[in-house]
Amino acid sequence: MGVKAPVAVRVNPNVEAGTHKYITTGKAENKFGVDFERIESLYEMAARELLNLHLKGLQMHIGSQLTQAKPFLEAVRKVAPLAASLKEKHGIEFFSIGGGIGIVYQGTLDSGVQEWWNEDCAQLTLSTYAQAVVPTLQPLGLHIIVEPGRLIVGNAGALITRCLYEKNGKAKTFKIVDAGMNDLIRPALYQGYHEIIPVREYPSESCVTADVVGPICESGDFLAQN
């Protein structure tokens, strides 16, 4: 067809994201991206031998649910000179710096109001993020792509479940519900916090400390502990 495929290569900058190890994606031991030191030679080879490709950009993503600007700044500062070099040598047009801006999970009761994302609640906001990375990115003269992800849709849904049984064990009380890790895996896999609130009001004196667990046949099937 005579059409060149536009491509961008993902670089692994080997930067610590400061998030859960399962959603850290920019360290040398992670499976994602091409080693930082190999990128320039890879682009040179592609420009020389893979003439059906159009080298359009460079991409990175260091992890998810980051709550500080420092890792983003460290990654951008490390990769920006590489992006500038690729622009000069190969004419790349964009630099995608990935996503990963974390959100607040503890404020679920207020998640229906705009203020949920404000400076008082969020550890990392769009303004602090931009203040950190823009000064390094602006001189590149490239289109900058960002992937906001959960920052946009994190409070868009709720899981509604029903308590089926209460088990009073010797060491713990368990509230067994009709939803589990197959519906919401973050607590079990990432030790993620999700606030649980009753749909109907109950007297405060009826509250007990318990694990909220699902029906899946393994001990990791929980939505909240204690």
Predicted regions span which residues?
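Active-site-proximal beta-alpha core segment in soluble small-molecule metabolic enzymes
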Residues: 1-96, 103, 164-166
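Flexible glycine/acidic-rich beta-alpha junction loops that bind and position SAM and/or redox cofactors
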Residues: 15-19, 93-114, 145, 150-156, ...
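Residue-level signature of transmembrane alpha-helix interfaces in integral membrane proteins
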Residues: 26, 75, 112, 116, ...
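Short secondary-structure boundary segments
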Residues: 33-48, 113-129, 194-198
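N-terminal low-complexity, intrinsically disordered patches enriched in charged
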Residues: 35, 42, 66, 72, ...
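Acidic, glycine-rich loop-and-beta core segments that form the ion-binding/anion-interacting portion
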Residues: 73-144
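Charged (often Lys/Glu-rich) extended helix/loop segments that serve as interaction or gating elements
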Residues: 126, 132-226
